[in-house]
């Protein structure tokens, strides 16, 4: 299901969250878009863990 998702990730005690567009079946893509928006380099992304993916708005194509 495509739409706008609120994606949250955590590293140690730091939490980042952002609304990103994507498909719920592709959680890796949603996670990567979150990391890109917060300018987290690829070498440091393994430190972050996906916490929550919540649908904000469904978009039908």
Residues covered by each model-derived region:
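Short aromatic-glycine-(Arg/Gly/Cys) micro-motifs in beta-strand/loop hairpins
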Residues: 1-15
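Short, mixed-charge low-complexity intrinsically disordered segments
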Residues: 32-61
